[in-house]
Structures are given as C-alpha cells and as structure tokens.
Curated annotation (Swiss-Prot):
Enzyme class, first EC level, given as a word: lyase
InterPro entries in alphabetical order: Isoprenoid_synthase_dom_sf, Terpene_cyclase-like_2
Protein name as it appears in the record: Terpene synthase 5
Domain remark text: Contains several highly conserved motifs that are important for catalytic activity including the aspartate-rich 'DDxx(x)D/E' motif and the 'NDxxSxxxD/E' motif, both of which are involved in complexing metal ions to coordinate the binding of the isoprenyl diphosphate substrate in the active site.
Originating organism: Dictyostelium purpureum
C-alpha cells in the first residue's frame, strides 16, 4: 500500500439534496432469486454462507430500483446475481486466460441463442453446468417482459456483452506485478464500461415498458449522462474498495492508487482530487438533464414521461450505489482509509472463495 493515510470520510462526496430516494421495501425477490440459483446448482441452499453471499449481492437492487414492483425486481435480481457470480468466478485463481476467454464467449452466445447455442444444443439437460442453467433462466426472464419489444432485449444483451468483454482487458491492463498500474486515461476508458452502469440503467429497457423508442438508448446526450454517472460511481466505488483491492494485489485497478503514482501526491491530496472530479461529473449530469428534455420536447407526452422516468432512474442508481456500498459487507476492511468502511464485520463473506470451481 502507499503511505498509510489518516482516516477520511466519504461524506465529502457531493450529492444534490433533491437526489434523495427511499429504499425499496420489497424483499421477497432476494430469497426467490437465490432459490432459483439453488435449483440450477449455483449455490447450496443449506449453506448459510452461500445465502449470505447472494443476499449481499441481491440487496443492491432495492437501492438501485426504489420504484420497482416484485416482478421487475425479479428481473433486476436475476441480472445482478448472474453478473456478480460471473465476475467473481472469473477472478478465481484457477481461471487461466484460456478458460476466461472460453467462458466469456460461451455465455455471450447462450444469452443470444439460448438452448440453440452450439455450446448447449447437443447436450441433454442433465449435462448442463450450473452456470449454463442459470444463464438460460436469466435469458427467459429477460425475454418475458420484452417479448413485444425485442429491440429492447437486443439493446440490453448488447450492454451485458460489452460488460463481460471488459473484464479480461481490465485485469490485463494492470500489468504483471501488483504494483504496476495502467495509465489513468486507459483505466478510465475500460472502467467506464466495466463498472457496469450501462447495463444497470439498461435493466429498465427490459423490466419497464417506458414507451421510449429504442433509438433513445443511443442518444448522445443520454449516453454522455450515463458516462458521467459512471465516472462518479467509479470514483466512489474505488474509494470504498481501496483497501480490499490493495490487499488482493489489485492496486492497478483502482484510480486512487493509479493517481498516487501518476501525480506523486499523498493519498489525502489524491482523494481531494477525485472528490472534485466526482462533483463535476454530477454537475455535468444536471446540465445534460435540461438539455435532453429540451431537445426531445417534440416527443408525445407518453414518451416524454418515459424519458423523465429514466433520468430519475439514473439519479436513483447514483445515490443507491452510494447507500448500498456503505451498508454491504463486501467493502468493509480493517485497513480502509475511510471511517465508514473501516472495521471487521463478522458477516463478511469471502466472496472470491465461495464459488465452486465447476460452475461453468
């Protein structure tokens, strides 16, 4: 680790006062989504650590999507469970480069083609792996609410595949030694995709019939808003995960570490720098909110309401990410430089050790 910093507070991050949203009070989706994964063989239903892992992942949707009903939460939860399992699984020590590439190609194709994928088409159901089965469950859950909006399903699958094709480049970018680091500009480009905000926001394209035209998702103003929101979330998440990433030899994947090396500044000075960057990102989002509504003012009321819904959803995710990150045990660490995430939590589950090596 770089020089040991004094304890700082994450309260320095700026969030507009009007960006205040209650957590979703529905929780049934957590157990139901976990049970689906158990049926597929992803988890052992009798193992408390397995449920603790899943719960730590799935409760994020109650923060990200405060207005969702149960069925919409089930869509979001299936996505999040699949994403976290795949990401954590690919980080396992036994996963060689070849195995990682195979998994990425395989699950991309299953999402696109389902049971017709050449990876599965010749196999009996009993021969499918746990991750094969759960990917089919996810695909079915995505298709159900969007069966009459196939373009939105395609948009969302595009966001998912962009995300999981970014996993390996991010790992490779840090170099062969844990003290190596990628140039900040390269890191920012890859991490903007890898943070996953495009698919987290894109959940709305399948779970909610917003009535917006499919072309909205490539509107350059909207894309810029999501990019700035991703920047804010990257910075905040890199702060809360700083100690854990340093401890796991992932320093080269953290903007705080990269900037300490690049700028030759103390941790405290770098923290001030990134907090200001995050604040400016919020300001850019707010400016583009106004611009987006103005440029789309010609839309009929129903579609404009959908646009405004998505604008508010982006805010909810930015704020929800903060609130979830501060309550999940995933980021608690003895060496955290931040008051809010420092400590030893007995409920912490070592997620990188939970998953069975035969999932794929």
């Amino acid at each position: 680790m770089q020089e040991k910093p004094n304890l700082l507070s994450l309260k320095k991050f700026y969030f507009p006062k009007e960006w205040s949203y209650p957590v979703n009070t529905i929780s049934k989706h957590i157990r139901d989504t976990f049970d689906e994964a158990v049926e597929c063989g992803l988890f052992d239903g009798s193992n408390e650590k397995h449920f603790a892992y899943a719960n730590g992942v799935l409760n994020c949707v109650t923060w990200f999507y405060p207005k969702y009903d149960y069925e919409q939460l089930m869509v979001a939860a299936a996505i999040m469970q699949w994403i976290f399992v795949l990401d954590d699984f690919l980080e396992r020590d036994h996963m060689t480069d070849e195995k990682q590439q195979y998994c990425v190609r395989k699950y991309e194709d299953i999402l696109i083609q389902g049971r017709s994928s050449p990876y599965l088409s010749t196999l009996d159901d009993c021969c499918l792996t746990p991750l094969d089965k759960y990917t089919l469950v996810l695909r079915k859950r995505l298709l159900k609410p969007s069966e009459n909006r196939i373009e939105t399903f395609n948009i969302f699958v595009h966001y998912l595949r962009e995300w999981f094709f970014s996993i390996i480049p991010l790992k490779k970018s840090k170099g062969d030694h844990h003290t190596d680091s990628v140039p900040y500009e390269v890191y920012s480009f890859i991490r903007t995709i890898n943070i996953g905000l495009y698919f987290v926001v894109g959940v709305n394209s399948v779970a909610v019939d917003t009535k917006v035209h499919g072309s909205f998702w490539i509107n350059p103003i909207w894309q810029r808003m999501v990019r700035h929101a991703a920047k804010q979330i990257i910075i905040f998440n890199d702060c809360v995960s700083y100690a854990k990433e340093i401890n796991h030899d992932c320093a080269g994947e953290n903007c705080l570490y990269i900037l300490q090396k690049k700028l030759n500044l103390s941790f405290e000075k770098v923290y001030e720098h990134v907090v200001e960057e995050a604040k400016q990102a919020i300001f850019e989002i707010q400016k583009d909110e106004v611009l987006l509504v103005e440029t789309l003012s010609y839309l009929p009321e129903e579609q404009m309401n959908g646009v405004k819904y998505l604008i508010e959803q982006l805010r909810e995710i930015v704020v929800g990410n903060r609130d979830w990150a501060l309550m999940t045990p995933r980021y608690v660490h003895n060496d955290s430089p931040f008051i809010e995430t420092r400590g030893t939590d007995p409920s912490i589950v070592p997620y990188e050790k939970i998953l069975n090596s035969n999932l794929y």
